Regions:
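Residues forming the flavin
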Residues: 17-22, 27-32, 37-38, 48, ...
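Flavin-dependent oxidoreductases
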Residues: 1-27
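C-terminal catalytic lobe of FAD-dependent flavoproteins
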Residues: 40-97
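Short acidic, gly/pro-rich beta-turn/loop elements at beta-sheet edges
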Residues: 4-5, 34, 44, 96
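Residue-level signal for well-ordered alpha-helical segments
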Residues: 3, 9-11, 33, 63, ...
Length: 97
């Protein structure tokens, strides 16, 4: 728990501004979800952990000896502007994409 708080002290979700972006946040049980390793127009990599881990360690070098419990691939979509889109549907209903 202390390690998790040191990674993201304000417990905010983060997306970097690199062209091949990485994104990360903490779960309720203080696990780090770290995404990235984008491969445009190609097949899913055979080993996503091998693709993601170097960038994760650039961001969080203190995780060098931490085991990755789960790794998966999938589609990630973003607008042409590459900027997040936020809005309000109703008084108490907000969205982000």
């Amino acid at each position: 728990e202390d390690v998790a708080r040191s990674l993201l002290p304000n417990n905010m979700a983060v997306e970097d501004c690199n062209y091949l972006l990485d994104y990360f946040r903490l779960t309720r049980d203080n696990r780090l979800i770290y995404g990235g390793g984008v491969v445009y127009g190609a097949r899913d990599p055979a080993n996503i952990e091998r693709l993601i881990r170097p960038n994760m360690l650039k961001t969080f070098p203190q995780l060098a000896n931490v085991k990755i419990d789960y790794a998966w691939t999938g589609n990630f979509l973003l607008p042409r502007s590459r900027l997040p889109q936020l809005g309000r549907l109703h008084e108490n209903v907000f969205y982000g994409k």
